[in-house]
Amino acid sequence: MSSAAHLSPKPFGRLLTAMVTPFDSDGKVDYAIAGRLARYLVDEGSDGIVVCGTTGESPTLSWSEQHQLLETVKSSVGKAVKVLAGTGSNSTAEAIEATVKAAELGADGALVVVPYYNKPPQEGLEIHFRSIANAAPDLPLMLYNIPGRTGSSIHPATVKRLMNCPNIISYKAASGTTSEVTDLRMQCGSQLAVYSGDDGLLLPMMSVGAVGVVSVASHIVGSRIKAMIDAYSTGQVNIALAYHEQLQPLFRALFATTNPIPVKAALEAIGWQVGSPRRPLSPLKKQMKEDLIDIIKSLRQI
């Protein structure tokens, strides 16, 4: 980790927050809190916000709810940061429709996940992403690889073939390995901006060429994650390492069970009424919540 000179361009900044979706006591989307939360995330250092991704519970949101969330967040933050919409689906036609709609609503980009459950082969993945890119040619796209949730993975060689789509410019790496970043850089060079999809792997991934992170923990410690990124990117590696080590207990606690269950509990603990996750997700267990709160309290004393 001796140098940051090799980092690729960063089209959406370095710190993006995968924002939770707030629900009220009746389980309905609380758009007012969503707007306030988005502004808070900007104040805490986020360069961009991703709405309706994994952390935003997209599987249990209707398309109309997703559209209104995008409009709410975009209106709330204005041009201060980039706002990306999660538009992925395991139906190519549906993903195209969602991506085109996001562009119409003013999104600055779209996060498009590898299709889940139906497990297409690499040829199918190439056709899927190329079709989406061609349907919304003016909207920058971030491919999203998270095989632990989707059941399949896009190969770096497939990504390389997609690089002739001008609007496929970035990639969220959430396979859990730094080698994913290395393999992508070997295939695509610096043309593709790779973001870590795991807070705990942010610094290791930056050391091999990632430009930043799509973060969950930035809901709680955004300014510290931003400081870690800034320290590394300016060659202050020891300072970055100190942040990396200091924040590991929180990073681990936020993924001790299915995301976004812990981060919603963490937000409640610091005063944000974001509600429980929608079913079939369930609230955080009592002991895990107590452990998480202890970690947050200890970080606030540092």
Swiss-Prot record:
Its main location: cytoplasm. The gene is dapA. Pfam families: DHDPS. This is 4-hydroxy-tetrahydrodipicolinate synthase. It catalyses: L-aspartate 4-semialdehyde + pyruvate = (2S,4S)-4-hydroxy-2,3,4,5-tetrahydrodipicolinate + H2O + H(+). Keywords: Amino-acid biosynthesis, Cytoplasm, Diaminopimelate biosynthesis, Lyase, Lysine biosynthesis, Schiff base. Its EC number is 4.3.3.7. SUPFAM superfamilies: Aldolase. Catalyzes the condensation of (S)-aspartate-beta-semialdehyde [(S)-ASA] and pyruvate to 4-hydroxy-tetrahydrodipicolinate (HTPA). It comes from Prochlorococcus marinus (strain MIT 9211). Belongs to the DapA family.
